[in-house]
Amino acid sequence: MAGAVQDSLGVDRIWTGILLAVLTGFVVYGGIKRIAHVADVVVPIMALGYIGMALLIIVINIGDIPAVIALIVKNAFGLEEAVGGGMGAAVAQGLRRGLFSNEAGLGSAPNVAAVAYVRHPVSQGIVQSLSVFIDTIIICSCTAFVILLGDVYVAGVQGIDGVVLTQQSLVSHVGGWAQYFLTAAILLFAFSSIIYNYYLGENALTVFTDTEISRHVLRILIVGLVFLGSSAPGATSVFFFSDPMMGILALVNLLAIIMLFPIGLRVLNDYRDQLRQGAEHPVFDPARFSDLDIDANAWRLD
């Protein structure tokens, strides 16, 4: 985000870091209600605005779409890439960056999903699976088309990358104003992501301690790290640390999913059975799962 602001507006990373740290502190000290309000306003604006811009570019360059799709498929699954190990590298890189985009399999998103008030857990599970589709298949594909339809990226040539590459690709399509649009979109996206991840951290902290002091320490650390991350010259060190950490998260969570699969299947079958019986909105009844340690108060319909 700081790189996008510096490239489009010429603002030094340190000033972006200071502003972002102040805004983050304001929100995290406001509690979950303020966090939810910020996310409700910010995320739809970011997603719809960016998708709309990408669709405009795709429509303008509709004749080049078949060639771009062919290029993607050829370079991902071609014989030359497979023999040279390129396909494996592409898959590995895709998995790593895919986790950054949607967190599927990490076990972090359920903490936020659990805040929602729903009649049945499967209902929220369906919504969560849709979010993965929107994040990766729609938004990330939009970015790929924007870059590949432009004339900024040259395969095999070392040059700009990351958000600056996307900015310059947008400029090549629709003019200089596009980099300001993307800067605003990145600001909205990154800020909402910071708030979201803070909530995950606070939620996880309660497992170990639930004191006011511990929450204040966490908030101070988050604000400080936001400043340091924004003012750092590049993201290489962040990815170097995050990649193995996400691998550990995924390993632990996937093992838990395997262990919980029988219970999850029972809950899913309960949802399907109610639909077959004509229920428009299935309701979760803990009494049907009396053998499990379920807090009945968590599923009371007031």
How would you label these PLM feature ranges?
Residues 53-71, 115-116, 130-163:
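Extracellular/periplasmic helix-exit of transmembrane alpha-helices
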